[in-house]
From Swiss-Prot:
Source organism, top-level taxon: Eukaryota
Alphabetical list of InterPro entries matching this protein: BART_dom, BART_sf, CFAP36
Main location: nucleus
Gene that produces this protein: cfap36
Alphabetically ordered keywords of this record: Cell projection, Cilium, Coiled coil, Cytoplasm, Flagellum, Nucleus
Residue ranges that the Swiss-Prot or TrEMBL entry lists as coiled coil: 142-179, 255-330
Name the UniProt record assigns to this protein: Cilia- and flagella-associated protein 36
Keyword Lyase: no
Segments of this protein annotated with the region Disordered: 175-220, 281-314
Biased composition (Polar residues): 187-202
Compartments it resides in: Nucleus; Cytoplasm; Cell projection, Cilium, Flagellum
Length: 338
């Protein structure tokens, strides 16, 4: 069993190190890693990209296992073997393990994104001799802006939740008022049927039962009147304004000057443009390599065709030689017979 696992792992390691695996996997990572950030929050786009990566890896592995003759059970047993969990092999098999482990996949994509950004910055520095001003300032203002916006959103959600709870209390109080009214009406009808002469007692009991309900309903009625006067957009603006006042945070976008905003935009556009140039150069180099391989294949095919033609000509020469031999032998026999 151990020897089978070692053989399967050796085959998979050789395949993972080859160009059939590395070229499509690296190309996928370079094109899809730009949206991955080193944050705790997982975006919805991460899941879609992970599913696409699963399909790619499963297709490549299935083709290799079918060519080598390894079954799916043997591959699973080899992955579960202790040898596959060693530190060295685990690092090499990281792209394969990322299919089932989303944390490994995210860390791998974040690392590739950082590598491409550093590569783009290095190329900029080599061309210009120095980095531009938009890439030299220290603190990242964008992350601070995102944190402040998240605080505002969470505060607005908290206020909307409180408003929703107040609305629910108002509705429950209204329902209780209706039930008490119906209950008092039934009591009045029952009392009038039993004692028609005594008509003052049900009215007094009805007033006594309605008094505490009216006291509870008054604050909710005021709140509901305010809610009716305000539209949905005004209510949302009021919640955000209240959140800013309570948290002591003003809008982060308004805190920035026009020069800082333009500098942030220049920085993002500059990096994006350099990144696209780098990817375009890589694509051109891959196309050139592919074209050279196609030319080599055509050359080898032409050589094979030439060798086949030579074989045919040799075969014809042999047939002619055989015919000449037969004619010579027949001539000699006829001469001896005469």
């Amino acid at each position: 069993m151990a020897s089978d696992a070692e053989w399967v792992l050796e085959s998979v390691l050789g395949f993972v190190s080859g160009p059939v695996w590395t070229v499509p996997v690296l190309e996928f990572m370079e094109h899809k890693c730009s949206v991955f950030d080193d944050d705790e929050e997982n975006k919805l786009s991460y899941t879609d990209i992970h599913n696409e990566y699963k399909e790619l890896v499963e297709t490549l592995l299935t083709q290799h296992l079918n060519e080598v003759g390894i079954s799916e059970e043997q591959f699973q047993e080899a992955c579960a073997a202790p040898l596959a969990h060693s530190a060295t092999l685990k690092n090499i098999l990281q792209p394969v393990l990322a299919v089932e482990d989303f944390k490994i996949f995210k860390a791998m994509m974040v690392q590739k994104n950082i590598e491409l950004q550093l590569q783009a910055i290095r190329i900029i520095q080599e061309r210009n001799g120095v980095l531009p001003d938009c890439l030299q300032h220290g603190s990242d203002i964008i992350s601070d802006l995102e944190q402040e916006e998240m605080k505002l959103v969470s505060e607005a959600l908290r206020l909307s939740k409180e408003e929703y709870e107040r609305e629910q209390l108002r509705r429950s109080a209204k329902e209780l008022n209706c039930t008490f009214g119906e209950h008092s009406k039934t009591k009045q009808s029952n009392g009038s049927e039993r004692t028609p002469s005594n008509t003052e007692l049900p009215d007094q009991s009805h007033e006594i039962e309605q008094q505490p309900v009216k006291m509870q309903e008054s604050p909710y009625e005021e709140a509901s009147m305010k809610l009716k006067e305000m539209s949905n957009t005004e209510a949302a603006e009021a919640w955000l304004e209240q959140a800013r006042k309570e948290a002591g945070i003003l809008s982060s976008v308004t805190n920035l000057s026009q020069a800082e905003k333009e500098q942030l935009q220049k920085r993002a556009e500059y990096l994006r443009r350099r990144r696209e140039e780098l990817l375009a150069k890589k694509q051109e180099s891959k196309k050139m390599a592919h074209n050279s391989e196609v030319h080599e294949e055509k050359a080898t095919c032409s050589k094979q065709e030439m060798t086949e033609e030579e074989k045919k000509s040799l075969q014809r020469r042999k047939q002619l030689a055989e015919k000449l031999k037969e004619e010579v032998i027949l001539c000699e026999k006829s001469g001896t017979a005469s």
